[in-house]
Design a protein with these regions (language model features):
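A short, basic N-terminal segment
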Residues: 1-94, 248-271
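A short, well-structured juxtamembrane/interface segment
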Residues: 90-112
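Short glycine-rich substrate-engagement loop in P-loop NTPases that contacts/grips substrate
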Residues: 94-101, 117, 132-172, 182-189
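A general structural motif
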Residues: 109-111, 170, 202
Length: 271
Protein backbone atom coordinates (compact mmCIF):
# COMPACT_ATOMS: atom_id res chain seq x y z
CA UNK A 1 0.00 0.00 0.00
CA UNK A 2 1.32 3.43 -0.98
CA UNK A 3 1.94 6.00 1.78
CA UNK A 4 -0.45 8.46 0.17
CA UNK A 5 -3.22 5.89 0.53
CA UNK A 6 -2.80 5.78 4.32
CA UNK A 7 -2.09 9.46 5.01
CA UNK A 8 -4.29 12.53 4.83
CA UNK A 9 -3.75 16.19 5.67
CA UNK A 10 -5.80 17.68 8.48
CA UNK A 11 -7.22 21.17 8.74
CA UNK A 12 -4.20 22.12 10.86
CA UNK A 13 -1.87 21.22 8.00
CA UNK A 14 -0.46 18.13 9.70
CA UNK A 15 -0.42 14.65 8.19
CA UNK A 16 -2.66 12.06 9.84
CA UNK A 17 -2.81 8.27 9.59
CA UNK A 18 -6.05 7.13 7.97
CA UNK A 19 -5.88 3.80 9.87
CA UNK A 20 -5.41 4.82 13.51
CA UNK A 21 -6.31 8.50 13.16
CA UNK A 22 -3.21 9.76 14.98
CA UNK A 23 -1.04 12.59 13.68
CA UNK A 24 2.15 11.57 11.90
CA UNK A 25 3.57 15.08 12.31
CA UNK A 26 3.81 17.65 15.08
CA UNK A 27 4.69 21.34 15.22
CA UNK A 28 7.97 22.49 16.69
CA UNK A 29 7.63 24.98 19.55
CA UNK A 30 7.10 28.58 18.50
CA UNK A 31 9.89 29.75 16.27
CA UNK A 32 10.52 26.38 14.65
CA UNK A 33 13.82 24.62 14.31
CA UNK A 34 16.36 25.48 11.62
CA UNK A 35 13.60 26.94 9.53
CA UNK A 36 11.33 23.90 9.88
CA UNK A 37 7.89 24.18 11.46
CA UNK A 38 6.99 20.48 11.65
CA UNK A 39 8.70 17.22 12.59
CA UNK A 40 7.84 13.55 12.17
CA UNK A 41 6.16 11.59 14.96
CA UNK A 42 5.09 7.96 15.16
CA UNK A 43 1.41 7.22 14.99
CA UNK A 44 -0.04 4.12 16.69
CA UNK A 45 0.49 2.09 13.51
CA UNK A 46 4.15 3.15 13.32
CA UNK A 47 4.70 2.27 16.99
CA UNK A 48 3.08 -1.14 16.53
CA UNK A 49 5.18 -1.87 13.43
CA UNK A 50 8.34 -0.85 15.30
CA UNK A 51 7.49 -3.05 18.30
CA UNK A 52 6.78 -6.02 16.01
CA UNK A 53 10.09 -5.49 14.21
CA UNK A 54 11.98 -5.32 17.51
CA UNK A 55 10.23 -8.48 18.74
CA UNK A 56 11.09 -10.30 15.51
CA UNK A 57 14.80 -9.52 15.81
CA UNK A 58 14.82 -10.26 19.55
CA UNK A 59 13.14 -13.65 18.97
CA UNK A 60 15.54 -14.38 16.11
CA UNK A 61 18.53 -13.53 18.28
CA UNK A 62 17.13 -15.75 21.08
CA UNK A 63 16.62 -18.72 18.73
CA UNK A 64 20.13 -18.38 17.32
CA UNK A 65 21.66 -18.15 20.80
CA UNK A 66 19.75 -21.20 22.06
CA UNK A 67 20.67 -23.17 18.94
CA UNK A 68 24.35 -22.27 19.31
CA UNK A 69 24.43 -23.10 23.04
CA UNK A 70 22.57 -26.37 22.45
CA UNK A 71 25.07 -27.53 19.84
CA UNK A 72 27.87 -26.82 22.33
CA UNK A 73 26.06 -28.47 25.25
CA UNK A 74 25.54 -32.00 23.98
CA UNK A 75 27.94 -34.61 22.64
CA UNK A 76 25.04 -36.38 20.87
CA UNK A 77 22.23 -34.68 18.93
CA UNK A 78 19.61 -37.15 20.24
CA UNK A 79 19.96 -35.53 23.66
CA UNK A 80 18.26 -32.44 22.27
CA UNK A 81 15.00 -34.43 22.35
CA UNK A 82 15.28 -35.12 26.09
CA UNK A 83 12.73 -32.58 27.28
CA UNK A 84 10.09 -32.23 29.97
CA UNK A 85 7.50 -32.02 27.18
CA UNK A 86 8.40 -35.58 26.16
CA UNK A 87 8.70 -36.89 29.73
CA UNK A 88 6.31 -38.53 32.17
CA UNK A 89 5.77 -35.62 34.53
CA UNK A 90 3.84 -37.80 36.99
CA UNK A 91 7.21 -39.31 37.92
CA UNK A 92 8.35 -37.95 41.30
CA UNK A 93 12.00 -37.52 40.31
CA UNK A 94 11.05 -35.81 37.05
CA UNK A 95 8.94 -33.42 39.10
CA UNK A 96 11.98 -32.67 41.30
CA UNK A 97 14.05 -32.03 38.19
CA UNK A 98 11.46 -29.54 36.93
CA UNK A 99 11.45 -27.84 40.33
CA UNK A 100 15.23 -27.52 40.10
CA UNK A 101 14.82 -25.62 36.83
CA UNK A 102 11.95 -23.49 38.12
CA UNK A 103 14.12 -22.47 41.10
CA UNK A 104 17.29 -22.12 39.04
CA UNK A 105 18.20 -18.61 40.20
CA UNK A 106 18.12 -19.71 43.84
CA UNK A 107 19.97 -22.95 43.03
CA UNK A 108 22.65 -20.94 41.24
CA UNK A 109 22.90 -18.37 44.00
CA UNK A 110 23.33 -21.08 46.65
CA UNK A 111 25.60 -23.31 44.50
CA UNK A 112 23.19 -26.28 44.76
CA UNK A 113 23.73 -29.29 42.50
CA UNK A 114 22.28 -32.79 42.27
CA UNK A 115 23.66 -36.32 42.27
CA UNK A 116 21.19 -38.54 40.41
CA UNK A 117 22.07 -42.10 41.40
CA UNK A 118 20.42 -45.49 40.92
CA UNK A 119 20.40 -48.70 38.86
CA UNK A 120 21.30 -48.88 35.19
CA UNK A 121 18.64 -47.76 32.72
CA UNK A 122 16.29 -45.89 35.05
CA UNK A 123 16.51 -42.60 33.15
CA UNK A 124 19.13 -40.62 35.06
CA UNK A 125 20.79 -39.25 31.93
CA UNK A 126 17.39 -38.39 30.45
CA UNK A 127 16.44 -36.44 33.58
CA UNK A 128 19.70 -34.48 33.45
CA UNK A 129 19.12 -33.84 29.74
CA UNK A 130 15.66 -32.45 30.48
CA UNK A 131 17.17 -30.01 32.96
CA UNK A 132 19.80 -29.00 30.41
CA UNK A 133 17.34 -28.41 27.57
CA UNK A 134 14.95 -26.39 29.70
CA UNK A 135 17.73 -24.15 31.00
CA UNK A 136 19.13 -23.75 27.48
CA UNK A 137 15.74 -22.33 26.45
CA UNK A 138 16.26 -19.71 29.15
CA UNK A 139 19.65 -18.75 27.67
CA UNK A 140 21.61 -20.49 30.44
CA UNK A 141 24.93 -21.92 29.27
CA UNK A 142 25.10 -25.67 29.96
CA UNK A 143 27.63 -28.38 29.17
CA UNK A 144 26.63 -32.06 29.45
CA UNK A 145 29.46 -34.53 28.99
CA UNK A 146 31.23 -37.45 30.69
CA UNK A 147 34.69 -38.07 32.06
CA UNK A 148 35.72 -40.46 29.28
CA UNK A 149 35.16 -37.65 26.77
CA UNK A 150 36.87 -35.10 29.01
CA UNK A 151 39.93 -37.32 29.49
CA UNK A 152 40.16 -38.04 25.75
CA UNK A 153 39.88 -34.33 24.93
CA UNK A 154 42.35 -33.19 27.54
CA UNK A 155 45.06 -35.81 26.95
CA UNK A 156 46.77 -34.18 23.93
CA UNK A 157 46.52 -30.62 25.26
CA UNK A 158 49.61 -28.79 26.41
CA UNK A 159 47.53 -26.44 28.57
CA UNK A 160 45.11 -28.67 30.47
CA UNK A 161 44.25 -25.89 32.92
CA UNK A 162 42.64 -23.82 30.17
CA UNK A 163 40.33 -26.72 29.24
CA UNK A 164 39.39 -27.34 32.88
CA UNK A 165 38.70 -23.62 33.38
CA UNK A 166 36.45 -23.67 30.31
CA UNK A 167 34.37 -26.46 31.87
CA UNK A 168 34.11 -24.40 35.04
CA UNK A 169 32.85 -21.38 33.09
CA UNK A 170 29.49 -22.88 32.07
CA UNK A 171 26.61 -21.76 34.27
CA UNK A 172 25.71 -25.44 34.72
CA UNK A 173 28.01 -28.43 34.23
CA UNK A 174 26.49 -31.92 33.95
CA UNK A 175 28.76 -34.96 34.26
CA UNK A 176 26.98 -38.06 33.00
CA UNK A 177 27.74 -41.65 34.07
CA UNK A 178 30.31 -41.07 36.79
CA UNK A 179 32.10 -44.34 37.57
CA UNK A 180 32.41 -45.85 34.08
CA UNK A 181 35.67 -44.05 33.31
CA UNK A 182 39.15 -45.50 33.69
CA UNK A 183 40.56 -45.85 37.21
CA UNK A 184 44.15 -44.97 36.38
CA UNK A 185 46.02 -42.51 38.56
CA UNK A 186 46.10 -40.09 35.62
CA UNK A 187 42.35 -40.32 35.00
CA UNK A 188 41.46 -39.91 38.67
CA UNK A 189 43.75 -36.88 38.84
CA UNK A 190 41.92 -35.24 35.93
CA UNK A 191 38.53 -36.07 37.47
CA UNK A 192 39.50 -34.50 40.77
CA UNK A 193 40.87 -31.39 39.04
CA UNK A 194 37.62 -30.90 37.08
CA UNK A 195 35.38 -31.45 40.13
CA UNK A 196 37.54 -29.33 42.43
CA UNK A 197 37.80 -26.45 39.95
CA UNK A 198 34.06 -26.56 39.35
CA UNK A 199 33.24 -26.39 43.04
CA UNK A 200 35.70 -23.53 43.59
CA UNK A 201 34.00 -21.66 40.75
CA UNK A 202 30.82 -21.56 42.84
CA UNK A 203 28.70 -22.74 39.92
CA UNK A 204 26.26 -25.69 40.20
CA UNK A 205 27.19 -29.23 39.22
CA UNK A 206 24.88 -32.12 38.31
CA UNK A 207 26.16 -35.70 38.20
CA UNK A 208 24.52 -38.98 37.19
CA UNK A 209 25.90 -42.34 38.27
CA UNK A 210 25.04 -46.03 38.56
CA UNK A 211 27.16 -46.24 41.71
CA UNK A 212 25.16 -46.94 44.90
CA UNK A 213 25.19 -44.01 47.30
CA UNK A 214 26.40 -46.32 50.07
CA UNK A 215 29.44 -47.22 47.95
CA UNK A 216 30.14 -43.56 47.24
CA UNK A 217 30.01 -42.67 50.93
CA UNK A 218 32.08 -45.66 52.07
CA UNK A 219 34.82 -45.53 49.39
CA UNK A 220 38.22 -46.29 50.94
CA UNK A 221 40.52 -45.62 47.97
CA UNK A 222 42.05 -42.23 48.74
CA UNK A 223 41.94 -40.80 45.18
CA UNK A 224 38.26 -41.71 44.80
CA UNK A 225 37.43 -40.72 48.37
CA UNK A 226 38.51 -37.12 47.85
CA UNK A 227 36.56 -36.95 44.55
CA UNK A 228 33.36 -38.24 46.16
CA UNK A 229 33.77 -35.98 49.19
CA UNK A 230 33.92 -32.94 46.90
CA UNK A 231 30.85 -34.11 44.98
CA UNK A 232 28.78 -34.67 48.13
CA UNK A 233 29.87 -31.25 49.33
CA UNK A 234 27.87 -29.61 46.54
CA UNK A 235 25.44 -32.19 45.11
CA UNK A 236 22.26 -33.33 46.85
CA UNK A 237 21.74 -37.10 46.29
CA UNK A 238 18.49 -37.96 44.47
CA UNK A 239 17.64 -41.63 44.02
CA UNK A 240 16.29 -42.66 40.62
CA UNK A 241 14.73 -46.11 40.90
CA UNK A 242 12.05 -48.10 39.14
CA UNK A 243 12.26 -50.58 36.30
CA UNK A 244 14.86 -50.22 33.59
CA UNK A 245 13.50 -47.95 30.87
CA UNK A 246 16.09 -49.35 28.47
CA UNK A 247 14.75 -52.87 28.97
CA UNK A 248 11.18 -51.62 28.47
CA UNK A 249 12.14 -49.85 25.24
CA UNK A 250 14.07 -52.90 24.01
CA UNK A 251 11.09 -55.15 24.75
CA UNK A 252 8.73 -52.80 22.92
CA UNK A 253 11.04 -52.73 19.89
CA UNK A 254 11.30 -56.52 19.93
CA UNK A 255 7.51 -56.89 19.88
CA UNK A 256 7.26 -54.32 17.09
CA UNK A 257 9.91 -56.17 15.09
CA UNK A 258 8.11 -59.49 15.54
CA UNK A 259 4.87 -57.93 14.30
CA UNK A 260 6.53 -56.43 11.23
CA UNK A 261 8.58 -59.52 10.40
CA UNK A 262 5.57 -61.81 10.71
CA UNK A 263 3.46 -59.70 8.36
CA UNK A 264 2.50 -61.64 5.21
CA UNK A 265 4.84 -64.50 6.03
CA UNK A 266 2.25 -67.25 6.07
CA UNK A 267 3.10 -69.93 8.60
CA UNK A 268 6.67 -68.69 9.17
CA UNK A 269 6.89 -67.11 12.59
CA UNK A 270 9.56 -65.28 14.57
CA UNK A 271 10.16 -66.91 17.91
Amino acid sequence: MREEDTVCVGSDGLQYCKVCGEAKEAFFPEGGFMGMKKHFRQCACDRKAYEEEQKYFKDKEHRELVSRNTSICFDESRMEEWTFENADMSDAVMHKAKSYVDNWEEMKRNHIGCLFWGPVGTGKSYIAGCIANELLKREVTVKMTNFNTIIDNIFPLADKTEYINALASYQLLIIDDLGVERNSEYALGIIFSVIDRRIRSGRPLIITTNLPLKEIKSETMLDKRRIYDRILEMCTPVYVGGTSKREAIASMKMEKAKTLLNTNRGKEKCE
